[in-house]
Swiss-Prot record:
Record's protein name: Alpha-amylase 1
Main location: secreted
Any Pfam family: Alpha-amylase
SMART domains with a match to the protein in the record: Aamy (SM00642), Alpha-amyl_C2 (SM00810)
Species classification: Eukaryota, Viridiplantae, Streptophyta, Embryophyta, Tracheophyta
Active site feature: 203, 228
Molecular function GO terms recorded: alpha-amylase activity; calcium ion binding
Organism: Arabidopsis thaliana
Main function: Possesses alpha-amylase activity in vitro, but seems not required for breakdown of transitory starch in leaves.
Positions of Ca(2+) 1 binding: 116, 162, 172, 207
Length: 423
């Protein structure tokens, strides 16, 4: 009887701390940038200071950097996957402490899963560095050249042909190898059960077939998962982004469908690319030929994760810095699952503005599959109604005429933006 009472209490406590989230209420937060490993006192320890603010903003899932030993300090050249004590972000104990603190605030942690490639400990004359160690006392993840794709141009192993794109910084792992599938799945499940992660951010999913992502999702049952499928967009001869990016967003949709859908989402790079061009006086871009949002959120919003910048794009494909808040006005009032970037929320002083927008989103029940009616998409004005509950506009044009009905009241406004709620 005591055991039963304990079980019932534990179950009740779980649902109090972790209410049942659907994609409609999910809100992501990327907790790091490319320089976070340099944090004095350790990144994991430093993040404790921001947990209350992150929780108060309504964040449900927090994306953490790759946790394993890595040749590169940022974590994206992992080697001994079970070794979490050699990470530049902090120790295994510090990571577990951070995740526990997040859990106590009802926030679930996502691990950055880098499995397309892996760095090795020893080399031979043919394959180069192709002898791997897993970071345990046994032979888990201790691999040799037979676990490396045989058509890797820089590290020619003896495994199966690569099922995706090449990455020349480290050997491409053969994900068709049954032992690779088994041991990586076991490692990911260990990250869940022993470390406390609830889900995954899959790095560089272009590096292996979509069926491989599907397999790891099925084998690990994450609460939430998102893949990084970053393809080039189309540009015209003048160097400007083409208006029609349907092929680009269709590629994201196809990847989701082939990888199984469900809890799996994809970063909406289409929306990011279009939005950062649109805010430069080309807001007409934000309406496709069918009158819908032009990104992935226009065709598969329930599996789209919208964002303004991340640790990579912030260095190489950055959103116009003076228009970042306009970007958040857009993604936090539109369908899809928004992801807030550490730099903008913590370092740029946008905490209050972003929190206000999140509050409006949550108050009105705007979610990943909310409806959008675009009422204006001109060079200097974009105005849309979401779920017949919220109207938003971005752009310098002030006169919106009769586009905002009298039964809507201004909820929040600033330079070149406004948000109204239904009375």
């Amino acid at each position: 009887m005591t055991s039963l009472h304990t079980l019932l209490f534990s179950s009740l406590l779980f649902f109090i701390v972790f209410p049942t989230f659907t994609f409609s209420s999910t809100l992501l937060f990327q907790s790091f940038n490319w320089e976070s490993w340099k944090k004095e006192g350790g990144f994991y320890n430093s993040l404790h200071n921001s947990i209350d603010d992150i929780a108060n903003a309504g964040i449900t899932h927090l994306w953490l950097p790759p946790p394993s030993q890595s040749v590169a300090p940022e974590g994206y050249l992992p080697g001994k996957l079970y070794d979490l004590n050699s990470s530049k972000y902090g120790s295994e104990a510090e990571l577990k402490s951070l995740i526990k603190a997040l859990n106590q605030k009802g926030i679930k942690a996502l691990a950055d899963i880098v499995i397309n490639h892996r760095t090795a400990e020893r080399k031979d004359d043919k394959c180069g560095y192709c002898y791997f160690e897993g970071g345990t006392s046994d032979d888990r993840l201790d691999w040799d050249p037979s676990f490396v794709c045989r058509n890797d141009p820089k590290f020619p192993g003896t495994g199966n042909l690569d099922t995706g794109g090449d990455f020349d910084g480290a050997p491409d792992i053969d994900h068709l190898n049954p032992r690779v599938q088994k041991e990586l799945s076991e490692w990911m499940n260990w990250l869940k059960t022993e470390i406390g992660f609830h889900g995954w951010r899959f790095d560089y999913v272009r590096g292996y077939a979509s069926s491989i992502t599907k397999l790891y999702v099925q084998n690990t049952s994450p609460d939430f998962a998102v893949g990084e499928k970053w393809d080039d967009m189309k540009y015209g001869g003048d160097g400007k982004l083409d208006y029609d990016q349907n092929e680009h967003r269709s590629g994201l949709k196809q990847w989701i469908e082939e990888a199984g859908g469900g809890v799996l989402t994809a970063f909406d790079f289409t929306t990011k690319g279009i939005l950062q061009s649109a805010v430069k006086g080309e807001l007409w871009r934000l309406k496709d030929s069918q009158g819908k949002p032009p990104g992935m959120i226009g065709i598969m919003p329930g599996n789209a994760v919208t964002f303004i910048d991340n640790h990579d794009t912030f260095r190489t494909w950055v959103f116009p810095s003076d228009k970042v808040l306009l970007g958040y006005v857009y993604i936090l009032t539109h369908p899809g699952t928004p992801c807030i970037f550490y730099n903008h929320y913590i370092e740029w002083g946008l905490k209050e503005s972003i929190s206000k927008l999140v509050a409006i989103r949550n108050k009105n029940g705007i979610g990943s599959t909310s409806s959008v009616t675009i009422k204006a998409a001109e060079a200097d004005l974009y105005l849309a109604m979401i779920d017949d509950k919220v109207i938003m506009k971005i752009g310098p044009k002030q006169d919106v005429g009769t586009l905002v009905p009298s039964n809507f009241a201004l909820a929040y406004s600033g330079l070149d933006f406004a948000v109204w709620e239904k009375k």
